[in-house]
Amino acid sequence: LAATFTSEAAKETRELVIGRLEDEHIIEKENPYHHTPLIKTFHSLGLMMLSEQSDRLGLLNHPTILDSSDSLSIIKKAVEQLGLDPKINDPSKIRSIISREKSDFVSVTDYKVKVASAQMEIIHSVWRIYQEELKMQKAVDFDDLIVRAVHMLEDHEDIRGYYQNRFKYIHIDEYQDTNGAQYAFIKLLVNPAHNNICVVG
């Protein structure tokens, strides 16, 4: 398994690996993906794993994935619904705060406990509406893909063991850019029996 941050980086890495394996006659040019290592972004890896285990988790096999613009659109509507001035309560900044909190495993319920200012109360109100809209659309955002995958691995020992055995060697690109959720994701995927992991960055 190789994990990186962008689809472009994953594509370039995949092409390089396939080219090298073909040169070494390890894989056939006619069927290059048959024995190729799995190379994905963190988010696409999370989505793949959640989809594979959807029956166990009671999830849709192919949930709607909201990109950044979709998320921002919902947050703009939430700001409007609450009668807030978007010039004072910038939807882009609110989205960034929600994303950061999710990446640190803070849920909307957890954030409510942290509220210590009027601005945080506003963020919580927007976040609550945002999560309700996601639930209604049966959708997840990018942050949910990794956070939910981490919770799955933490809560289900058999699923964690399956992926630890499946990914015997793990390579992480641009490791210095990982956030708390991505670090936890990596840690849970590494098999403690041999700790075969290489990080770059």
Question: Where do the model's predicted regions map?
Answer:
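Secondary-structure boundary motif
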Residues: 19-26, 81-84, 136, 155, ...
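ATP-hydrolysis module of ASCE/P-loop NTPase motor domains
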Residues: 33-36, 55-144, 167
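Generic alpha-helical structural context detector
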Residues: 44-47, 51, 96-99, 147, ...
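P-loop NTPase Walker
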Residues: 1-61, 65, 137, 161, ...
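Conserved helicase NTPase motor core
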Residues: 1-2, 9-10, 38, 67, ...
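Short helix-loop boundary/capping segments at the starts of domains
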Residues: 6, 19, 23, 55, ...
